[in-house]
């Protein structure tokens, strides 16, 4: 029989949506049985009390249960006493039935909710399993390795020219197809095991849920034991024992009053039992639902987390392997162009095939051992070259594979890949193996060549030793590698990668890979991908250094590159091919340090920034208090006036006091020696049209206008229609950014001749403030993608539409509400002191806005209004007010606490928009327009 439904008033919208969901029939029946067995009333009370009452003849079902004392006349017969006592006995007897009925309704409600919860989980489970199976099907149908390789082919092709490109085009499809077959086996294996895990998920989850519900409600017993109930029953038995019914000294009226008081106590006891048990059952029900959801999440974690991690890592491993294969071909393209391919391609293929095979076997071995796909490290990829290196020598691709016949793969397997076979595709590019295009190429004398096919690296080493290959990229010296640690610095792909990096870093961006350099991100896709996949070396000091003052290009020119370039065989025979030199060598003679540095350090230039992570210099270091302008990086690092703790001092900012003060002085201050470099200089006036220069701040030594407010890290990006997109970090931000960090979206003069002195409306200051709004260190750890609330790929490469930042708004509100108490502590302890210091430091004039609620003295208290006046000491005239609005996406018609004027005596024109603290009402989506959480929850600041 269907259990009784709870009333509609007790059902929320979520419950109404859930009632169509039903779990598996087995689970539904199991839940019903568990609740019926567990929620039975304990009848011990009836067994103990009722027989005792019956011995006094008090239990008469036909007697009335409503005896009122005022209905009993004085001097009535003892029959009334008996009826009154019997009504009390019936009341006790009915308590058990009442409690059972109430708990039966409670059981029905719980049964309904638990079944609906299980049904919803079953529905979600089916949906997720379907999605998982669909994802696995797509994963099998997509050739991950081919997909990953296509994105690199174009970049690598742009690096190669002539015969090098021919060699690359000949090699790339062959090795990728071969690697696809090897890698596809691992993909199918992962998909098969993941599918089995998904199919087992439902049965395992149902069993776990039933077991959990049974364990929870096994502790649920409905008891009739109650102090008031026991007290009433005992009192009734004592009345019978003392024969008060037959005692003529006790009037019927007094006796009935006593009985009615006793019945009231019994009824209160019954209600207390029902309420207590209902409360306990509700707790158990809530706990059971939480347990069911937890079991569901745990089951999904085991299946979907593994599925997601494996799919993600399969893709990463495919990218890793594809990039390595193509990179190896690129490195070898110059050395093994067509004139040498004829002699050495067989050995080259053997080496590459062993590398691919061993890499895929390593991936599968890790999966068998750990159950997870782990992307290969550079050393694991190089194992294909060096695992059987007997003579410990190293060449461009490092090491030898075992030359024995048993280790060399069957080349027929490689050539049988359809249209990519050697015989079919080579004719489309060049002549076949019998061509005489390069008749003068000497054949290297390879010892033992008649006995076995030499590997690529061995033959290339012999070729390099005999100086028959002027195009050789480089042959490392014969040395004892001394273990895997040294491989990172002197051998194999690492040394080649170092030279490749050097060439790419010293090459103009448009000659390698297209990309803008103004964005502070990678201008070169190849370098980005190489760094992404962990090709770290001992030569990567500038990317690991704690000093932000080292320039990467300086380092490359001044580091151990000389030792590496000594091994480069330059080829100057083909002047028409820009990349005719070694693929890893610069297009010109390696420039000296002094020839490289000026170009990257010229003010206003747009030097390359690399995503390579450098450790953030602590803002607490006392060494930063006296940093000079010439010690700061020119474009990579900008000011951070970030108060991430409540006791931060003035000098603890990233930049020195002198630079901050200099940034807000006007050009007419003759005593300042650096006026001509200020952001507000007449000759350095900026406009929104100068976006590229403004965002990089390369022209301005101070890197921005210092804001006399309690700043938080935020990235401001110009969008369409003059609207700026904001990017807020997830940590080290504070609530009141909406009150104090608001930039007026004011019009900017486009004239080049606007005099800063006559800038009465403050557009120059506003413009500088807008474009340098809380500048940040782009390589700061806090701005890692994982710590940013909303980020775009290649954010600096495109103008962003205002509609794209809408999700950030809700995210910020949710983050604020979740962390309000912590933020409140920061507000109470940190704002007053820090803002007072900044006001004194920069001579901030605070208008008396909403005077009735603010008692502030000039330059002594931080402006808590939404308006702050910047008064450079040299202007003398009315300073403009920066009307700092909520954000650039706010409605323009919102009433402000103060308008754009410098009259400090002007009162609020719209008192309704002023809170008791003088601040503008904080508009939260979904809240009343006059709701301000600060007034309600936070100390006024």
From Swiss-Prot:
Q: Where is the composition biased (Polar residues)?
A: 567-584
Q: Which InterPro entries match?
A: HHV6-IE
The UniProt regions of compositional bias labelled Basic and acidic residues, in chain numbering, are 14-23
Where is the sequence biased in composition, kind Basic residues? 606-626
Q: Where is this region: Disordered?
A: 1-23, 567-632
Name this protein carries in UniProt: Immediate-early protein 1
């Amino acid at each position: 029989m269907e259990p009784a439904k709870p009333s509609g008033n007790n059902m929320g919208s979520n419950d109404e949506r859930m009632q169509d969901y039903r779990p598996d029939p087995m689970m539904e029946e199991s839940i019903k049985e568990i609740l019926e067995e567990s929620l039975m009333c304990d009848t011990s009370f009836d067994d103990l009390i009722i027989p005792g009452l019956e011995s006094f003849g008090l239990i008469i079902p036909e007697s009335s249960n409503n005896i009122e004392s005022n209905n009993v006349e004085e001097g009535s017969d003892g029959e009334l006493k008996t009826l009154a006592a019997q009504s009390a006995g019936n009341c006790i007897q009915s308590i058990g039935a009442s409690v059972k009925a109430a708990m039966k309704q409670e059981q029905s409600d719980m049964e309904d909710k638990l079944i609906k919860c299980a049904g919803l989980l079953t529905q979600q489970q089916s949906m997720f399993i379907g999605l998982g199976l669909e994802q696995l099907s797509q994963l099998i149908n997509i050739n991950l390795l081919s997909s990953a390789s296509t994105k690199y082919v174009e970049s690598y092709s742009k690096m190669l020219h002539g015969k090098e490109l021919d060699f690359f085009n000949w090699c790339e499809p062959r090795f990728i197809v071969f690697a696809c077959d090897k890698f596809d086996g691992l993909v199918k294996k992962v998909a098969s095991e993941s599918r089995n895990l998904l199919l087992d998920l439902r049965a395992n989850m149902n069993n776990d849920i039933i077991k959990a519900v049974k364990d929870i409600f096994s502790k649920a017993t409905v008891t009739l034991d109650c102090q008031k109930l026991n007290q009433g029953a005992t009192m009734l038995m004592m009345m019978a024992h003392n024969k008060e019914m037959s005692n003529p000294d006790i009037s019927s009226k007094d006796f009935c009053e006593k009985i009615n008081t006793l019945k009231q106590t019994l009824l209160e006891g019954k209600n207390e039992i029902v309420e207590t048990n209902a409360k306990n059952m509700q707790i158990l029900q809530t706990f059971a639902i939480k347990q069911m959801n937890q079991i569901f999440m745990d089951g999904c974690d085991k299946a979907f987390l593994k599925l997601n991690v494996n799919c993600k890592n399969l893709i990463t491993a495919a990218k890793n392997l594809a990039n390595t294969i193509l990179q190896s071909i690129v490195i070898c393209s110059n050395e093994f162009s067509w004139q040498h391919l004829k002699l050495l391609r067989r050995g080259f293929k053997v080496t590459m095939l062993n590398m691919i095979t061993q890499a895929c076997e390593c991936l599968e071995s890790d999966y068998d051992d750990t159950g997870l796909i782990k992307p290969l490290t550079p050393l694991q990829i190089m194992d294909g070259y060096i695992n059987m290196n007997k003579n410990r020598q190293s060449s461009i691709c490092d090491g030898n594979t075992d030359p024995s016949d048993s280790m060399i793969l069957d080349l027929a397997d490689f050539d049988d890949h359809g249209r990519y076979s050697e015989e079919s595709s080579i004719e489309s590019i060049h002549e076949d193996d019998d061509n005489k295009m390069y008749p003068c190429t000497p054949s290297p004398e390879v010892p033992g060549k008649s006995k076995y096919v030499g590997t690529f690296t061995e033959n290339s080493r012999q070729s390099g030793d005999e100086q028959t290959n002027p195009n050789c990229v480089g042959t490392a010296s014969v040395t004892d590698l001394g273990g895997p640690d040294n491989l990172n610095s002197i051998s194999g792909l690492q040394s080649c990668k170092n030279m490749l990096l050097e060439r790419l870093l010293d090459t103009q961006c448009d000659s390698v890979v297209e990309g803008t350099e103004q964005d502070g991100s990678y201008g070169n896709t190849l370098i980005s991908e190489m760094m992404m996949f962990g090709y770290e070396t001992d030569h990567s000091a500038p990317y690991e250094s704690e000093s932000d003052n080292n320039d990467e290009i300086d380092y490359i020119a001044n580091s151990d590159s000389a030792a590496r370039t000594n091994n480069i065989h330059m080829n100057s025979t083909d002047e028409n091919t820009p990349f005719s030199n070694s693929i890893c060598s610069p297009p010109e003679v390696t420039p000296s340090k002094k020839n490289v540095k000026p170009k990257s350090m010229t003010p206003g230039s747009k030097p390359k920034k690399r995503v390579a992570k450098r450790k953030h210099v602590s803002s607490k270091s006392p060494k930063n208090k006296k940093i000079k302008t010439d010690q700061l990086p020119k474009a990579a690092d900008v000011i951070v006036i970030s108060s991430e703790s409540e006791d931060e001092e003035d000098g603890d900012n990233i930049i020195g006091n002198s630079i901050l003060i200099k940034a807000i002085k006007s050009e007419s201050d003759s005593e300042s020696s650096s006026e001509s470099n200020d952001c507000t200089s007449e000759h350095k006036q900026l406009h929104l049209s100068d976006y590229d220069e403004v965002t990089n701040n390369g022209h301005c030594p101070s890197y921005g206008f210092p804001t006399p407010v309690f700043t938080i890290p935020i990235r401001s990006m110009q969008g369409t229609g003059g609207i700026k997109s904001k990017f807020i970090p997830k940590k080290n931000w504070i609530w009141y950014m909406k009150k104090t960090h608001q930039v007026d979206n004011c019009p900017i003069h486009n004239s080049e001749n606007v005099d800063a002195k006559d800038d009465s409306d403050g557009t120059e200051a506003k413009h500088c403030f807008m474009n340098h709004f809380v500048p940040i260190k782009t390589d700061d750890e806090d701005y890692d993608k994982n710590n940013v609330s909303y980020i775009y790929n290649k954010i600096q490469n495109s103008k962003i539409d205002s509609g794209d930042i809408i999700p950030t708004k809700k995210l910020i509100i949710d983050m604020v509400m979740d962390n309000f108490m912590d933020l409140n502590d920061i507000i109470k302890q940190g704002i007053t002191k820090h803002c007072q210091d900044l006001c004194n430091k920069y001579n901030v004039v605070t208008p008396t806005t909403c005077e009735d609620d603010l008692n502030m003295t000039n330059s002594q208290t931080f402006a808590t209004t939404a308006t702050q006046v910047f008064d450079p000491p040299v202007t003398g005239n009315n300073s403009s007010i920066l009307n700092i609005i909520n954000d650039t996406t706010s409605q323009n018609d919102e009433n402000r606490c103060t308008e754009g004027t410098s009259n400090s005596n002007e009162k609020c024109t719209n008192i309704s928009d002023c809170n008791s603290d003088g601040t503008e009402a904080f508009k939260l989506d979904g809240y009343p327009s006059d709701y301000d959480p600060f007034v309600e929850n936070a100390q006024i600041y």
